C-alpha cells in the first residue's frame, strides 16, 4: 500500500499524537493493512493459463486449453449483428429471454424425452462455470460435503470451498476412469449435500454408460442428496454412442441441476453463455443466487442463439468432432506415445510411462518439455487431482483446424 500523504484530506492512516520536546504535534504514519486471510490459499494461476502462456512464449502449437482455433458459423455472427441492430441491447429478463428457453426445452424433450417448463425450470447463465457456482451457492451450507470425481475439472473444488463446503474426492479408476461405486457409497455421510458428475468427461474423454447411470440412481435412491450434472460436451459423443443425460432418468432429474454450454456447442467459448435445467423448486433457489451473482446475460447473444438453434446444427457436432479426433489420431498413431481412447469431448490423452527416457519425469515437467523442445503444448492430467496424482498422462485438445492438428502431429512424431 502506498505511503499516505500528510494532510487532513488524504491521510487515511491512523493519526498518532506524540509529544516532542514538550510540544504536542500530530504526525501521520502509514500503518500497513494486514493481508486478508485467503479463502483459497492453495489456489494459484490455473494450469491452462500457464501452459497457454508457455505456448505463446516458445511458439508451440497450443493443444492445451480447450478452445477452437477456427471461426463459428457465419450465420451465427449475422444473427448476433441482427439482434444488436434490432435494438436488443438492454437488460433481458433475469432468467433469460423466453424464446431461448423455449428452444432449449424443445431440444431437451427431443433428445432426452424430458419436458422442462421454459418459464420456471430453465435459466440462462454466463457460461457453465457460473452455472456451477450458482448451483452450489444455492444448496451448499457451511460444512456440507460435496462428492466430486477425480480427475476433475479444476473449478469444482474452489467453488465448493468458496461456499463453505467440503469437497470429498471419489476416484475414477485409472486407466479406464470408471467410478468405483463401492467407494462412492463409503464416502456418503450425514453431511453429504450433493454429488457432482461430468459426462462426457473432461479431461479423460470418457462417457458414462447406462450401467453407471443406473448405479447412480441406486446410490441416491431414498436420500436427499442433490446432483449437479456438468454436460457441456453433451453433443460430442462418438462412435454411435448415446449421451446418457441425467434428463433421461426421472429419479435423477428430480434432484438435479443439469448444465450445458452454448459456447462449447457453437464454437463461441468467448461468448460465455450456457444454461441450467432443474425442477421448479430447485430453479427457484438457483435464481435467488443467480440474480446476485450475474443478474442476467448478454442480450443479443440470447436472441442470436435462439434463432440459430432452429437450424439444428448441434445434431452435426458428433460427426464434426469425431472427424477431428480421427484425423489427429491417424497422424500420431505411430508415435511413441500411447494414446488413450477418446469416447467424447474434444480431448484425447496420451501416456508416456513406457518410455524409458521420460518415465521418471513428472507429467508437469513432461508437458513443459513437449512445449519447449518439440513445440506442442498440452495439459498434465495431474492438474485435475487435488493431490497431483501422476499417471504420466497428458491431455491434448483436437478442437483445431486440420492444418493445426497436422503440424502438432508432425512435431509429436519426433518425441
What residues fall within each predicted segment?
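Conserved PLP-anchoring active-site segment centered on the Schiff-base-forming lysine
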Residues: 138-160
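PLP-dependent aminotransferase class I/II
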Residues: 255-344
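Conserved PLP-binding catalytic core of the aspartate aminotransferase-like
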Residues: 321-322, 335-373
Amino acid at each position: 500500500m502506498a505511503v499516505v500523504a500528510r494532510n487532513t484530506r488524504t491521510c487515511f492512516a491512523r493519526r498518532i499524537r506524540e509529544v516532542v520536546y514538550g510540544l504536542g504535534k500530530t504526525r501521520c504514519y502509514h500503518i500497513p493493512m494486514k493481508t486478508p486471510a485467503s479463502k483459497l490459499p492453495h489456489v494459484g494461476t490455473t494450469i491452462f493459463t500457464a501452459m497457454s502462456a508457455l505456448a505463446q512464449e516458445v511458439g508451440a502449437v497450443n493443444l492445451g486449453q480447450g478452445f477452437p482455433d477456427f471461426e463459428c458459423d457465419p450465420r451465427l455472427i449475422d444473427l448476433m449483428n441482427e439482434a444488436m441492430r434490432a435494438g436488443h441491447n438492454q437488460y433481458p429478463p433475469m432468467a433469460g429471454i423466453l424464446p431461448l428457453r423455449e428452444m432449449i426445452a424443445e431440444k431437451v424433450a427431443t433428445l432426452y424425452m424430458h419436458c422442462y417448463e421454459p418459464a420456471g425450470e430453465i435459466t440462462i447463465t454466463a457460461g457453465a462455470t457460473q452455472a456451477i457456482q450458482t448451483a452450489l451457492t444455492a444448496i451448499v451450507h457451511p460444512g456440507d460435503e460435496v462428492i466430486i470425481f477425480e480427475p476433475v475439472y479444476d473449478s469444482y473444488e474452489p467453488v465448493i470451498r468458496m461456499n463453505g463446503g467440503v469437497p470429498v474426492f471419489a476416484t475414477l479408476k485409472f486407466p479406464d476412469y470408471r467410478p468405483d461405486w463401492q467407494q462412492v457409497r463409503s464416502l456418503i455421510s450425514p453431511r453429504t449435500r450433493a454429488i457432482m458428475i461430468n459426462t462426457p468427461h473432461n479431461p479423460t474423454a470418457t462417457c458414462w454408460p447406462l450401467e453407471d447411470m443406473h448405479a447412480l440412481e441406486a446410490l441416491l435412491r431414498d436420500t436427499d442428496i442433490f446432483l449437479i450434472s456438468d454436460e457441456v460436451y453433451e453433443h460430442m459423443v462418438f462412435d454411435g454412442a448415446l449421451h446418457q443425460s441425467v434428463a433421461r432418468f426421472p429419479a435423477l432429474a428430480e434432484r438435479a441441476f443439469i448444465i450445458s454450454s452454448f459456447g462449447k456447442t457453437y464454437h463461441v467459448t468467448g461468448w460465455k453463455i450456457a444454461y441450467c435445467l432443474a425442477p421448479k423448486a430447485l430453479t427457484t433457489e438457483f435464481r435467488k443466487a443467480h440474480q446476485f451473482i450475474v443478474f442476467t446475460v448478454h442480450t443479443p447473444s440470447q436472441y442470436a442463439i435462439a434463432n440459430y438453434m432452429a437450424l439444428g446444427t448441434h445434431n452435426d457436432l458428433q460427426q464434426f468432432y469425431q472427424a477431428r479426433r480421427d484425423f489427429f489420431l491417424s497422424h500420431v498413431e505411430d508415435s511413441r506415445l500411447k494414446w488413450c481412447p477418446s469416447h467424447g469431448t474434444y480431448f484425447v490423452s496420451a501416456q508416456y510411462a513406457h518410455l524409458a527416457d521420460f518415465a521418471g519425469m513428472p507429467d508437469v515437467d513432461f508437458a513443459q518439455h513437449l512445449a519447449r523442445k518439440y513445440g506442442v503444448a498440452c495439459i498434465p492430467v495431474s492438474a485435475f487431482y487435488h493431490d497431483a496424482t501422476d499417471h504420466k498422462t497428458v491431455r491434448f485438445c483436437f478442437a483445431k483446424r486440420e492444418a493445426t492438428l497436422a503440424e502438432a502431429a508432425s512435431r509429436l512424431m519426433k518425441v
